[in-house]
Amino acid sequence: LGVAGCCALMLCGFGIKDSITDIPARQFTHVTTEDATLYFNNVTKEEAKEVLNNETSFQSYAILNNTNATIGKYDIYISVLSENFEEFQHFYDLDTKEKCDLNDDEVLISDKLASLLKVKKGDTIEFYDDNNNYNMKVGAVVENYIQHFIFMNERTYNKNSSKDLTYNTAYVELGDLTKDEQLDLQAKMLENSNVLNMTFIQDSIDQANDMLQTLDKVVVI
């Protein structure tokens, strides 16, 4: 390769490492900002609120539904967001970097999925889940670094779906809890038959950072 080629590869390696290692912080402190996530067994809004309102450790929350769906040859998630989601889920236009609204009769689409589908703001996209086919206008292409997502609000779902909306996820804000207190809270939540699991966002950040540290060895080599 020669000296110039080797130097170019070294610079490329450092650049890749720096760009990838920013992803956990960008996703979990900029795009989504919950402290923990509860996973429900497809409950009504009233059932979800009963669980959440009865726990004093939860300072605030937002309820949503994440559903597997297909668009073209790609597997995606449809995320239907209920009230108060703006506290935890933040949408930034890929081009302008400005915050986006999740308007009625529109969807927001994550940037990697938009690139794969070659769609942009203002286009109409068709996708389907187990119960419905959707033809929706793209309100904006937004930043997202994990999985492929299409986001819509509750009113848009109810207008376009033949099935009543249930909820399988909640983002929650916690007070200052120690690790032991978090584990106790998790065990308490899992005693409820409507709760399938509870995870903490800091654990996800730590796991992602641990995996990314392996890049240091690659860069050194």
Model-predicted segments: where are they?
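Short, conserved charged micro-motifs
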Residues: 44-50, 177-187
